[in-house]
């Protein structure tokens, strides 16, 4: 019904809102907007100002959201009375008008689920005619306004065509007609759905985008083509179809790409992009519902990377399995991966390597990446490594990365950062996730790395997660440290346990070096009899210098505050507290200057490895503490 009366308010400015009349407004049902859980009278208002080039528009003092092109604006308001105030800025001049109405619902004020389209008459030097559309929603439980932002389609090549829009899980399309620019606006439904695909003249194009978003495509001769690159040479990507285009040919794989929105892969079988040679920047938008289950070649969003992948976020995945290497971001990396995140949890049934970010880092660089997902190995074949960041690292670097996700199942060579490291540099990384592996799991598991050798260096890393395994060689930092490998300036504060050979820093060390590290965590044997459990190392055949232990060590025999068994090599200038011997008698190795806290305290003059940054900027320690004044702190440690 019409509102009947005309409400007039006078406003000052270049444009005088002399009359705002509501006379027999068209009431158009907006069922696609209904049932949004909003408070009563929370209202969406659309303003179309015709030819006036408004530079700003506010509603009740709130900045309106500019949508579309030209003069179309949209705002969400919550008036305290049945009315609202509109301010329009044109040529730096502000004009304000108020709209009010009687509070009686019989007058038809702000009826739920309806949009009111009324004429807006603006008198002044610039006369135009536009519309105000008001859509309001009934009283609900409160919450966010799902579905309020419309989907904006911009499809070059389908101008003036009608397209069919299919939501995920539905075979009933909605028809939308694009204008002469290939554009259309569609109000999103509630709850927000995923646009799975669109079709035109029988040809379908994969989308994978949430409603209430910008969906852009370029169609040439009925096929998807890349859109124009930006001023930095990056080609925009915001749909499944465009993502698949990267693997079109060698030239495509060498270009630069910029992800423009969240992409949902719809849990359909994904064929990994074979090898990126250019740059892919995910812009911290997400990729969801990744599924690679066929077990062929490498598995991941990318099969291999020889270029640069950055700012990619894997939000979820249902399967990840490769014949060789599996990683959420990529299977094998020979290039650079930086600032990427995996949140997905998966179970792998047979890949040789599995990583939260990358399966096999082959002389590549991985930096500032994070895994929060749980990785589970459910396989009867041996694994070459499972890690929160990387399964296997060979002659590469991993810096500034973290893992908070758990690792379970029956893997071997497992690490919070890297499962296996061969001549790999791991620096400034941390693990807080738990590695809890049952009977039947393999050996060599550590908070940072599982198995290391050949000039591998682990430095400035820490672990606070639990590392327990029914097998052998468990360490807070590394499970097994082999010939040529070094751990320096690291600490463990997590619980560590194994059937044999468990240590706060390393479960076993053979012809390797541990220097300037400390353990604060509980070390325990998971069996009776010979344990090989130590605060720094369980079974030792290498070199340990300037380390200390202040945690606990439990077990039947072959246990010590520094090492469980000192088979060979040298241990020097290490300290501990508690009732245990630092180094049990009977081993074949040598030792120098090892003391219990209280009997002695480390000093810079004790050994050069105990120098502090006050004397030597590159020293391992920031402070050495004192009896009753705290224990030594590493240079980087808080």
Ranges and model annotations:
Residues 1, 72-84, 179-195, 201:
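Short Pro-Gly-centered beta-turn/loop motif in secreted/extracellular proteins
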Residues 2-7:
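Short, small-residue-biased leader/transition segments that mark boundaries at the very start
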Residues 8-23, 90-96, 195-212:
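A short, solvent-exposed loop/turn motif at the edges and junctions
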Residues 22, 26-82:
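Short helix-loop boundary/capping segments
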Residues 33-42, 77, 120-124, 146-149, ...:
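Conserved "repeat-terminator" motif of extracellular CCP/Sushi domains
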Residues 46-54, 150-167:
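Structural motif
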Residues 63-71, 169-183:
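Short, acidic Ser/Thr/Gly-rich low-complexity loop/linker segments typical of extracellular
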Residues 220, 225-638:
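Predominantly extracellular beta-rich ligand-binding scaffolds that present long acidic/polar faces
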């Amino acid at each position: 019904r019409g509102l009947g009366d005309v409400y007039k308010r006078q406003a000052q400015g270049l444009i005088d809102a002399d009359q705002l009349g509501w006379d027999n407004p068209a009431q158009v049902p907006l069922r696609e907007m209904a049932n949004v859980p909003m408070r009563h009278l929370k209202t969406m208002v659309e303003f179309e100002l015709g030819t006036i080039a408004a530079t700003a528009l506010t509603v009740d003092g709130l900045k309106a959201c500019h949508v579309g092109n030209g003069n179309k604006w949209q705002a969400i308001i919550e008036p305290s009375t049945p009315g609202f105030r509109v301010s329009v800025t044109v040529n730096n001049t502000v004009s304000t008008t108020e709209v009010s109405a009687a509070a009686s619902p019989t007058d038809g004020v702000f009826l739920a689920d309806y949009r009111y389209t009324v004429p807006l008459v603006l008198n002044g030097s610039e006369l135009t005619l536009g519309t105000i559309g008001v859509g309001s929603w009934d009283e609900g439980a409160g919450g966010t306004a799902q579905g309020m932002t419309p989907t904006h389609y911009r499809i070059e090549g389908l101008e003036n065509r009608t397209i069919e829009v299919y939501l995920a899980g539905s075979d009933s399309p909605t028809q939308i007609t694009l204008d002469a620019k290939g554009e259309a606006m569609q109000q999103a439904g509630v709850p927000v759905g995923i646009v799975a695909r669109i079709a035109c003249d029988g040809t379908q194009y994969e989308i994978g985008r949430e409603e209430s978003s910008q969906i852009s495509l370029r169609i040439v001769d009925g096929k998807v083509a890349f859109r124009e690159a930006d001023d930095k040479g990056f080609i925009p990507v915001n749909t499944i179809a465009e993502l698949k285009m990267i693997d079109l040919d060698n030239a495509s794989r060498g270009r630069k790409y910029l992800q423009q929105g969240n992409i949902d892969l719809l849990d359909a079988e994904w064929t990994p992009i074979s090898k990126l040679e250019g740059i892919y920047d995910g812009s911290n938008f997400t990729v969801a519902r990744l599924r690679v289950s066929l077990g062929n070649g490498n598995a991941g969003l990318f099969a291999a990377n020889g270029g640069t992948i950055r700012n990619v976020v894997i939000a979820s995945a249902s399967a990840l399995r490769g014949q060789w290497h599996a990683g959420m971001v990529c299977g094998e990396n020979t290039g650079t991966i930086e600032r990427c995140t995996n949140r997905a949890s998966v179970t792998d049934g047979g890949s040789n390597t599995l990583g939260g970010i990358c399966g096999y880092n082959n002389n590549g660089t991985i930096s500032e990446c994070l895994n929060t997902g749980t990785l589970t190995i459910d396989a009867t074949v041996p694994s070459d490594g499972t890690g929160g960041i990387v399964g296997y690292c060979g002659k590469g670097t991993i810096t500034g990365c973290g893992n908070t996700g758990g690792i379970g199942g029956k893997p071997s060579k497992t690490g919070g950062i890297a499962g296996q490291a061969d001549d790999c540099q791991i620096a400034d990384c941390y693990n807080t996730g738990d590695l809890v592996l049952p009977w039947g799991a393999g050996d060599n598991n550590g908070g940072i790395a599982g198995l290391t050798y050949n000039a591998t260096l682990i430095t400035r890393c820490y672990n606070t997660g639990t590392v327990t395994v029914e097998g052998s060689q468990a360490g807070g930092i590394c499970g097994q440290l082999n010939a040529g490998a070094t751990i320096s300036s690291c600490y463990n504060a997590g619980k560590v346990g194994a059937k044999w050979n468990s240590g706060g820093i390393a479960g076993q060390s053979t012809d390797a070096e541990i220097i300037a590290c400390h353990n604060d965590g509980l070390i325990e044997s998971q069996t009776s009899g010979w344990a090989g459990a130590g605060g720094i190392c369980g079974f030792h055949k290498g070199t340990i210098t300037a380390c200390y232990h202040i945690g606990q060590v439990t077990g039947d025999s072959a246990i010590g505050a520094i090492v469980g068994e000192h088979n060979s090599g040298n241990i020097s200038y290490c300290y501990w507290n508690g009732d245990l011997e630092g180094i049990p008698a009977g081993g074949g190795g040598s030792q120098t200057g090892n003391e219990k806290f209280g009997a002695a305290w480390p000093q810079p003059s004790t050994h050069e490895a105990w120098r502090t940054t006050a004397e030597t900027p590159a020293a391992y320690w920031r402070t050495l503490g004192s009896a009753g004044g705290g224990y030594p702190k590493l240079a980087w440690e808080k």
